[in-house]
Amino acid sequence: MENRSSSGTPRPSAGSPDAAKRPSETSPAAGRIPAGQNGSSGDKKRKVTEEGEASEKSEPPADRPMSKRKRMEERHQKLRKRGRTPPSAYSRRDAEAAPVPNRNRDDPANRSLSPLPHRSPTPEEQPRQRKRPGGGARMGLVDRETLRRRQEERERALVEEAMRTSQGRGVTDVVRQHYNAVPQRGREWRKTESKIKGLRSFNNWIKSTLIQKFSPDEEFLARLNDGRDWADDSGPPPAEEKRLLVVDLGCGKGGDLGKWQLAPQPVELYVGLDPAEVSIVQARERYNSMKSGRGNRGRRNPLFHGEFAPKDCFGEWLGDIGIVQQVGIDPNAGPGGSVMSSRWGGGGFDVVASMFAIHYAFESEEKARQMLRNVAGCLKKGGRFLGVCPNSDIISARVVELNAKRKAREEQEKKEKSDEAPEDGEVEEDTKLEWGNSIYRVQFPGKTPEDGIFRPPFGWKYSYFMEEAVEEVPEYVVPWEAFRALTEDYNLELQYRKPFLGIWGDEKDDRELGPLSERMGVRDRNTGELLMTEEEKEAANFYHAFCFYKV
């Protein structure tokens, strides 16, 4: 039997080998003290027990179990010595799934014991083809060629669009700079010193005739011309009954302000627009002079309210001008608008005028359509579009005539030089056409159609010169039939078209316009003769006038 101390710790017996090896710990005789000298026997037992506990703390017995923490530390140390990383707390979560061996279903050992027929593998189990980088872009030569052609077409379209935009800005800037540079001359100079005073007066009379005949609305004209059309036989309407709202595209220096003040149906609002900023300033100054009473010359109608703004009327939308927005402009005018808008919609203006200006819009189809969209958008139903522009019939006749003469001359030269070889460096004959006289000149820089039909109808540029007025400014042919067909897309119906000299023949004896021509210095009061030279008549015949109705 083992002897136990008071603390319950087992103690080896006297005959065990441990007792022989450590006599100081187990033998009572090794540290025995005589009784009665240093305390009682209980004190001796307590002292021996405390010494045994101290020795047990310093050296644990070999058979005492090791703690779990210490075992883990020793294990980690061994793994580090072998070059392996000990597992972390996340080793189970992050451990990769063990690869599942590819089982051969044909092997009888791997075959399922189910009596049901074997099911085909699901799409997820089928092997997937690997996609190589850029594999979708690899295609045949035909597809690559198609893509290349499309890319080239897109790039070419972008370049052409950029060129058209830059060229459009260039022509507009040239025209703007030219009219900004034209000096302001007074009325006295135009009547006495001008070389083309007869042509100036005649052109002003033509514009006055157009305003007198076509600016009033149908109701006003019916009451003015024939009171019997009305049940009450009231005669001409009073001036305050209905007044006109007018917008002038290309108003210049305001030379037509007086003509609009003399309109049969009084004007309530006049909006003048022009791309030349200097011209707008001068037009505003002329209007302020008329408003203050200077140069009014006793006109019967009160002066209308006038608004002026610089604007490219053919290359830009007019809807961002404040006064135009207030009066009203239809953004749906034209072929892209809705059916209801074209039938019931419209702007708020009674008249849109454009004198000697619309030929600048025929640089391109885009500009021509933008011009007509502005016109149709401003006009109310029944409104009028008045204007004058170069006569394409005159231009075509001249082109056919000059091309025929050039062709005959070339054939004659070929017959004369049929045996002669062309010399080195010989330049081909210039194909440009030119005609005019001392006061005006028209010149086409390149080839022109021999039959006089301009196809396509846009972009046929020529240079025009007019003494004291226009200095070699680029203009564009307005092929009339193409223009008339284009206006139908904007609900504009042609009502009137006449060359300048034809208007004179029709209206010179009118009871109102005849005396007006005498007051304006167009006709001699005594002889009735037209006060223009033959060269001025030729220059005047280059133009014609027109009027469209908004339907």
UniProtKB/Swiss-Prot annotation:
Q: Which residues form the mRNA cap 0 methyltransferase domain?
A: 194-551
Its signal peptide is none
Q: Where in the cell is it found?
A: Nucleus
Q: Annotated site (mRNA cap binding), which positions?
A: 253, 259, 286, 359, 475, 543
Any one GO cellular component localisation term in the record: nucleus
Spans of biased composition, class Basic and acidic residues? 48-76, 141-152, 408-420
Q: Domain of life here?
A: Eukaryota
| Keyword Nucleus attached | yes
List all Polar residues biased stretches: 1-10
Instruction: Spell out the Acidic residues composition-biased ranges.
Output: 421-430
Any one GO molecular-function label of the UniProt entry: RNA binding
Which portions of the sequence form the region Disordered? 1-152, 407-430
Q: Which PROSITE patterns match?
A: RNA_CAP0_MT
Keywords, A to Z, come to:
Methyltransferase, mRNA capping, mRNA processing, Nucleus, RNA-binding, S-adenosyl-L-methionine, Transferase
Q: What is its EC number?
A: 2.1.1.56
Q: Where does mRNA bind?
A: 203-204
Reaction it catalyzes: a 5'-end (5'-triphosphoguanosine)-ribonucleoside in mRNA + S-adenosyl-L-methionine = a 5'-end (N(7)-methyl 5'-triphosphoguanosine)-ribonucleoside in mRNA + S-adenosyl-L-homocysteine
Q: Which family does it belong to?
A: Belongs to the class I-like SAM-binding methyltransferase superfamily. mRNA cap 0 methyltransferase family.
Which PANTHER family does this one have? MRNA CAP GUANINE-N7 METHYLTRANSFERASE, MRNA GUANINE-7- METHYLTRANSFERASE
Protein known as: mRNA cap guanine-N(7) methyltransferase
